[in-house]
A protein has these predicted regions:
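Acidic-enriched and Gly/Ser
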Residues: 20, 85-88, 131
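Conserved NTP-handling cores and scaffolds of large molecular machines
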Residues: 37, 41-44, 88-92, 153, ...
Length: 182
């Protein structure tokens, strides 16, 4: 009931995508979330709390820009900490090393594709929603392309509906190497 109420009030595609699917994540992605959480909690938040306390000691808070900004920044940090905590609590860490030697596409795979319709070759890594980074070739496992790739092997063809129209791909290579090796 709570989820239905939230969906009716906030029909965002981001909310529904995050609520409907498990939060699969690679060990590297989880470490990145944890590092951000630790940096905010152990370093940035205490500094802002100290700044707010100093600003509050200066007297009138109604026109105290340091105090007003500090309180706003503290709310932003606390909001981000809550978000990170929820994402880490819901995380299902999947180590791609456990899938070494598999020729099928699953979570964590590096997939080299030949885009038949444009005569181009692309390499993508299928990762969790919190790891999405198109500049590195990281695509979310719930994206249309990644979902169409699941279970495919080298030599398989697939068609994917994209905002620019239908694209046809051929799987050239599937690999489960670590990101450092790429």
């Amino acid at each position: 009931m709570r989820e239905a109420l939230l969906k009716s009030r906030f029909p965002s595609p981001h909310f529904s995508a995050m609520a409907e699917y498990k939060n699969y994540i690679t060990p590297e992605g989880y470490a990145t979330l944890k590092a951000e959480f630790d940096q905010l909690y152990r370093t940035e938040r205490p500094k802002v709390v100290s700044d707010v306390a100093w600003a509050a000691s200066n007297g009138d808070r109604s026109e105290n820009a340091d105090y007003i900004y500090g309180k706003r920044r503290l709310r932003q940090i606390d909001s981000r900490l809550r978000f990170l905590m929820k994402r880490m609590d819901a995380a299902v860490v999947v180590d791609p090393k456990d899938q070494q030697g598999l020729e099928k596409v699953f979570f964590g795979a590096w997939v080299t594709l030949y885009l038949i319709t444009k005569d181009e070759e692309h390499t993508y890594r299928i990762v969790g929603q919190d790891e999405l980074d198109p500049s590195k070739g990281y695509i979310s496992w719930i994206s249309p392309l990644a979902r169409a790739l699941m279970g495919k092997r080298p030599g398989d063809s697939l068609r994917v509906e994209t905002p620019g129209g239908e694209e046809e791909y051929e799987v050239l290579e599937v690999d489960y190497r670590s990101p450092e090796a790429s």
